[in-house]
Amino acid sequence: MGKAGGNKKKSTGTPRRVSWLGVLLLLMTGIVPLGLVGTFLCVYIPPGRFGITTLLGLAFPWLVLASAALGIAYLFFFKKRCLIFFAAILLNFHNLGLSVRLPHNDRPRRDDHRMASATRPSEFKVLSYNVCLFGYYAQDDRNGRKDRIASYIGVEEADILCLQEYYESKAPQFRIRETLRKAGYRHHTRLLENARFYFGNAIFSRFPILRQDTVPGLSPLNALYADLQLPGGDTLRVYTFHLASLRFDDHDKALYHELLNKPLDESVSYKAEAGKIARKVSRAARIHAEQVRQIKAHAAACPYRVLICGDMNENPVSYAYHTLAKGLKDAFTERGVGLGRTYSGFFPAYRIDYIFHRAALDPATGKVSDGMDARLATRHFEVGAVDYSDHRPISAVINY
């Protein structure tokens, strides 16, 4: 009897470990698919209603990876349950297509635009680039960054430049416009200025500018447009935009890296600090939603071909992207490859810079006809592999 009682008290601890693993898997089985349902819905829900939808959009790549990993794991143990994870991914098939693109067999060479310009005159190349003030505040490498960015622009030989966070000192050693004029950009939009420098968004073009203005209701620091005269006489309206910054300070950046590296450090109030970052993200998303509505409404009334380029500060799985992209073609989804990541600085390290376009409206219907829409198509898209700014440049060759 003594031995039997003693045997009852023995425990190897293995069942407890299995139990904790089971609880973790059970939680993940519920959280991950629900998170992906949330990412599917977040592009339709204005961020002012539920702030968490913005955060779910940012978590989308990690939720997909977690769902795929759990689906494969369950495939070996609980085959029916694995369908939950794959169904959640399938629900987000469109969002997945916005986030990653497979290579094309007929992808043209990056230098093909200039080589074929004589035989294919009905196309233009656009370069959109947040130049981060041309590195003006990089005190140890100010002129070096400016010169490298200007050199990159010259090598790309785009017909249209959409530059965000443009900066040009009135001091003689920092004259950007003169450099760009020598590269063939004889036309540009008006720049904001004070006593010492020019700044803001800017459109530079090899084509004549017929008209330029700001988008009603928005600051020229957020968006402006210009009507360009293409070869042959057609008009192209070009918008460039820079939506509100997330306004992360050095403390936020340090906390973010600490959260990644020391998630269990009790010396920091993570809940309060992480909540501060989440509130900044949600606040910016609400501002972005209103800004894109105004850009969208203005562009929708334009009868000409439309090109919209800029820094959205939002990833593709967001309400702002979905609102602006509806009815437009995204050059990346037409001809891009890979993840298309454009932000190389602090969070969010996703695709947040875009080139959209649409054909001219049919005068009879006020809508884009199928024939006109088919003619305006992206032939080539590329994310520049340079780190001269905290953003990478993006370019597209578009047939019209």
What is each model feature region?
Residues 39, 62, 81-82, 89-123, ...:
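Structured beta-strand-rich core segments of catalytic domains in phosphoester-bond hydrolases
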Residues 123, 128-146, 168, 247-284:
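Acidic/histidine-rich helix-loop elements
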Residues 137-143, 215-217, 344-346:
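Short, solvent-exposed loop/turn segments at secondary-structure boundaries
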Residues 1-19:
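N-terminal Lys/Arg-rich, disordered targeting/topogenic segments
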Residues 129, 183-189, 327-334:
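Short hydrophobic/aromatic-enriched beta-strand-loop microsegments
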Residues 125-131, 145-173, 226, 237-242, ...:
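Active-site beta-strand/loop signature of hydrolases that rely on acidic residues for catalysis
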Residues 21-36, 41-76, 83-86, 94-95, ...:
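Metal-dependent phosphoester-hydrolase catalytic domains
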